[in-house]
């Protein structure tokens, strides 16, 4: 349940989050496992183990889980089976098969192999902050986040969202933090960053390297590079990598945070889940608020 990434979206207009209605809407897109002829399935799964509810809610915070099952068919296995069939049929009919015939054969091969294929399951968590009209998604890629949002949009009928963007250019702020050594008091720069030039392929990745290094500072001072990613630590609470597109990757909560609710018995799974969710959302909501303040608020939209 602890988020490892944070991609945040702004609801451009408030929605009515009636929980009874939400449950009904989510049930229309509930996850069901792949049948023998299904290549993939995508739908809502219960966040709380053993619960029939397809959402988990505390106060004004809602948690959803989008589950995806994909059948894994290695391309070389499909190709080998297909090549055998094509060769056999061409010899039998003494002619070369047409492209459309080969595609039909391939579809048939896939359908025959699917029942024996392994499954890969993927869970994507969506945290809806109804108080601040934000949706946070635990996803490392825009595609995965957009897929989850598309499922929510399908369930609700509409979902007016845009990626959260800051008023001040993040790369400019990040660069100034390193150049002028003026990070906010609540943040500590770690020894990892990515420097980007004007050319897309002109990227320098620094790892386990002090960022006050003379060569790094010279590149930034000359304007040849800007800081596009920066590893940070926040108040001994968590570490993360902040990206210039306003996304957060590799979130890692401190052990002292994750152990805060250890006094709750392991047998009381629901209470522990509740307490951890409240703790996590409180921390990440505060982090989002602090970042918004530090980057000049939210970018104005036309």
Curated annotation (Swiss-Prot):
The alphabetical list of record keywords is: Cytoplasm, DNA recombination
GO terms for cellular component: bacterial nucleoid; cytoplasm
Establish whether keyword Cytoplasm is in the entry.
Answer: yes
Q: Which GO terms describe its biological process?
A: DNA recombination; regulation of DNA recombination
Q: Which GO terms describe its molecular function?
A: double-stranded DNA binding
Give coiled-coil spans as residue ranges. Answer: none
Pfam families per record: RdgC
- Superkingdom of this entry's organism? Bacteria
Location comes to: Cytoplasm, Nucleoid
Would the keyword Phosphoprotein be found if you checked this record's keyword annotation? Answer: no
Q: Name the principal localization, coarsely classed.
A: cytoplasm
The family classification in the record reads: Belongs to the RdgC family.
Function description: May be involved in recombination.
- NCBIfam families referenced in this protein's UniProt entry, alphabetically: PRK00321.1-3 (NF001462), PRK00321.1-5 (NF001464)
Q: What is this protein called?
A: Recombination-associated protein RdgC
């Amino acid at each position: 349940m602890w988020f490892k990434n944070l991609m945040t979206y702004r609801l451009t207009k408030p929605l009515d989050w009636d929980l009874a209605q939400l449950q009904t809407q989510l049930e229309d897109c509930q996850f069901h496992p792949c049948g023998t002829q299904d290549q993939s399935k995508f739908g809502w799964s219960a966040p709380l183990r053993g619960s029939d509810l397809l959402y988990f809610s505390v106060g004004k915070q809602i948690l959803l889980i989008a589950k995806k099952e994909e059948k894994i068919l290695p391309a070389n296995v499909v190709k080998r089976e297909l090549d055998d069939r094509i060769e056999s049929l061409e010899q039998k009919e003494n002619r070369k098969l047409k492209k459309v015939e080969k595609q039909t054969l391939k579809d048939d091969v896939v359908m025959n192999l699917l029942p024996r294929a392994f499954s890969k399951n993927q869970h994507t968590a969506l945290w809806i902050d109804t108080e601040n009209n934000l949706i946070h998604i635990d996803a490392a890629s825009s595609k995965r986040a957009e897929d989850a949002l598309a499922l929510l949009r399908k369930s609700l009928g509409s979902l007016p969202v845009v990626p959260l963007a800051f008023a001040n250019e993040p790369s400019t702020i990040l660069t100034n933090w390193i150049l002028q050594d003026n990070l906010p008091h609540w943040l500590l720069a770690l020894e990892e960053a990515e420097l980007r030039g004007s050319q897309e392929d002109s990227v320098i990745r620094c790892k386990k390297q002090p960022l006050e290094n003379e060569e790094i500072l010279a590149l930034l001072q000359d304007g040849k590079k800007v800081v596009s990613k920066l590893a940070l630590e926040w108040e001994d609470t968590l570490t993360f990598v902040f990206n210039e597109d306003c996304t957060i990757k590799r979130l890692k909560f401190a052990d002292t945070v994750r152990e805060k609710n250890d006094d709750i018995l392991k047998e009381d799974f629901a209470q522990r889940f509740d307490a951890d969710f409240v703790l996590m959302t409180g921390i990440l909501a505060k982090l989002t608020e602090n970042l918004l303040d530090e980057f000049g608020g939210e970018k104005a939209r036309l």
